[in-house]
């Protein structure tokens, strides 16, 4: 997101405690290695127009679920206070479409019911509520961005994730000529190429588009079997693609506002996989 937004000329101040992911060297990017939960804060940022709160802990041991939830809630509170201090005009809270998946549906949208299945989704739903209440009280425009199944082809577990995405596991297995596995061939998922997230977000910013809640997902939803066949170097066969279970849990999300968003050039999976393979061959 940092790399993508900076390419549009935005002046970016990025804060993180470790920066385990690659940030481009760019005159528009200033990296601040800080912890939002720390009592000591630098004064390197005087003010900003937009605050994007993307920080969240996703990993936890079974006995640390409560602390994960509390830490994420505290991160959100600190981010909101900082946004107020910096006189931000707009606050984006990055949430997840995982908040929908308690209920069995073919597809989910912004009007679907939400439920906290685990400490992570609980922290997201509480964070959404806190952000809404704080921003409304302090007259800060806000948007809750629920991000879906994003992929880029080069994910690393060290990027604070418990596991890589299903897409990345298939890509990794295919490179090693291993069997591609899924719970059900007909599981339907939304797939958003990671490069599209900053493009869509930039479009929202420069066009001053405002949504209280927005599923920031591409309009492309595919069944697992379609993606597996596209990734595979071989033709579909029982020896190559293995069905583990028969139960299907669809988690495809779409946005009811997709036609109102000015950004239209969402990357198809075929184009994305070609970009990934071209990059690998460099």
Place the predicted regions along the sequence by residue:
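NAD(P)-dependent short-chain dehydrogenase/reductase
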Residues: 132-188, 194
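Conserved Rossmann-fold NAD(P)-dependent oxidoreductase catalytic core, especially the SDR/UDP-sugar
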Residues: 78-119
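NAD(P)H-binding glycine-rich loop region in Rossmannoid oxidoreductase-like domains
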Residues: 36-71
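Short-chain dehydrogenase/reductase
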Residues: 69, 112, 117-128, 160-168, ...
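NAD(P)-cofactor binding segment of oxidoreductase domains
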Residues: 50-51, 63-92, 130
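N-terminal Rossmann/SDR dinucleotide-binding element
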Residues: 1-50
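C-terminal substrate-binding subdomain of Rossmann-fold SDR/epimerase-dehydratase oxidoreductases
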Residues: 175-282
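Active-site Tyr-X1-5-Lys
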Residues: 102, 115-143
């Amino acid at each position: 997101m940092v790399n993508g937004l900076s390419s549009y000329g935005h002046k970016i101040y990025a804060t993180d405690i470790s920066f385990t992911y690659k940030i481009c060297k760019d005159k528009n990017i200033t990296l601040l290695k800080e912890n939002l939960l720390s009592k000591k804060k630098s004064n390197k940022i005087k003010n900003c127009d937009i605050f994007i709160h993307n920080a969240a802990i996703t990993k936890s041991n079974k006995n640390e679920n409560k602390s994960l939830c509390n830490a994420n809630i505290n991160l959100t509170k600190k981010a909101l206070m900082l946004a107020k201090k910096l006189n931000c005009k707009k606050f984006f809270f990055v949430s997840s479409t995982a908040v929908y998946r308690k209920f069995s549906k073919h597809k989910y949208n912004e009007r679907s019911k939400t439920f906290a299945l685990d400490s992570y989704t609980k922290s997201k739903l509480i964070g959404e509520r806190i952000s809404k209440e704080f921003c409304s009280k302090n007259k800060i425009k806000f948007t809750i961005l629920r991000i879906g199944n994003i992929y880029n082809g080069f994910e690393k577990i060290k990027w604070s994730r418990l596991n890589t995405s299903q897409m990345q596991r298939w890509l990794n297995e295919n490179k090693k000529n291993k069997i591609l596995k899924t719970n059900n061939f007909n599981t339907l998922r939304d797939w958003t190429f990671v490069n599209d997230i900053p493009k869509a977000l930039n479009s929202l910013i420069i066009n001053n588009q405002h949504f209280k809640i927005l599923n920031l997902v591409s309009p492309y939803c595919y069944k697992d079997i379609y993606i597996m066949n596209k990734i595979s170097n071989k033709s579909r066969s029982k020896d190559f693609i293995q069905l583990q279970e028969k139960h299907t849990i669809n988690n495809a999300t779409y946005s009811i506002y997709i036609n109102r968003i000015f950004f239209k050039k969402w990357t198809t999976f075929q184009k994305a996989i070609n970009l990934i393979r071209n990059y690998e061959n460099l």
